[in-house]
Regions:
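Acidic, divalent-metal-binding catalytic cores of TOPRIM
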Residues: 1-161
């Protein structure tokens, strides 16, 4: 069982991945609902995938739950958009430089979170390409097996087995 925080593109992506695997994907429909979803599926082996950039306040209760139940694991990339940027799908020195030192580029007066910054960066870098990104609806290019595998290289392999 994979519980994703996201109900948009990240959820669509991991749902597509699950078609080739032996796990089910459900959306928590927001970080504040993850704990409820864990309780709903706690008899299963669970992987939680959530945006580390925005997870903060929800962490304490979930960490306690993980300590009580060793069949729960957590993967917290900065955001789904960060995963895509990190995958090298976008061959850009600008993106590589930003990913090396994001704090040098993220301006807090412009972006409420790193997730929003990485979303804006991904949208900008893909706007006139076949990889055009929209947070609300995953472009079918990201459902291509080669592209999915490239993105999944950023996810620890043992988590998705």
């Amino acid at each position: 069982m994979v519980i994703v925080e996201d109900s948009n593109s990240g959820y669509e992506f991991f749902s597509e991945v699950s078609k080739e695997k032996t796990f089910e994907v459900v959306s928590a429909k927001g970080k504040s609902n993850i704990f409820k979803k864990i309780n709903e599926y706690e008899k299963n082996k669970i992987l939680i995938i959530a945006d580390g950039a925005a997870f903060g306040a929800e962490m304490d209760g979930i960490v306690k739950k993980i300590r009580e139940n060793n069949s729960i694991a957590m993967y917290l990339p900065e955001s789904f958009e960060w995963l895509i940027l990190k995958s090298d799908l976008i061959n850009s020195n600008k993106v590589k430089n930003i990913l090396e030192e994001p704090s040098d580029y993220v301006e807090s007066k412009d972006y409420m979170s790193w997730e929003r910054f990485f979303t804006a960066l991904l949208v900008e870098e893909t706007k006139d390409t076949y990889l055009r990104y929209s947070k609300s609806n995953l472009n079918s290019a990201y459902k291509n097996e080669k592209i999915m595998n490239k993105i999944l290289k950023e996810v620890p392999e043992e988590l998705l087995d």
